[in-house]
């Protein structure tokens, strides 16, 4: 499977880690799995890690990804970790998410993203 998904930190958040060369269908499967885990755990925090992906994320992929996040309930907090070479897409992804009422912050470091996700802000 090209992704790992599980509730972490005793259900404090759901982590989805993607790896390899992913298709849009595999990305969608990861999002669907995350959605089911969030429903089961009752938490409102999601951490998505794209750092192990082997392909460059396109502008179209970012747009489609942001659109797919609309299925999550309002008020959900989402941290997105991307490879350093994809940092150019961070502001674009955050703006797309904000325009859809989604609280999303983009990071290049797992620990920093996790600290933000678990903080009260």
Please describe what each predicted stretch is.
Residues 1-121:
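Amphipathic, Lys/Arg-enriched alpha-helical "gate/interface" segment within cytosolic domains
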């Amino acid at each position: 499977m090209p992704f790992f998904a599980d509730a972490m930190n005793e259900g404090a958040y759901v982590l989805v880690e993607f790896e390899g060369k992913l298709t849009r269908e595999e990305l969608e499967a990861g999002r669907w799995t995350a959605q089911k885990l969030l429903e089961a755990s009752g938490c409102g925090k999601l951490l998505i890690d794209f750092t192990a992906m082997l392909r460059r994320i396109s502008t179209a992929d970012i747009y489609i990804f942001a659109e797919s996040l609309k299925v999550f309930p309002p008020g959900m907090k989402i941290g997105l970790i991307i490879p350093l070479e994809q940092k150019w897409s961070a502001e674009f992804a955050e703006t797309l998410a904000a325009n859809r009422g989604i609280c999303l912050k983009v990071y290049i470091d797992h620990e920093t993203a996790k600290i933000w996700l678990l903080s009260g802000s």
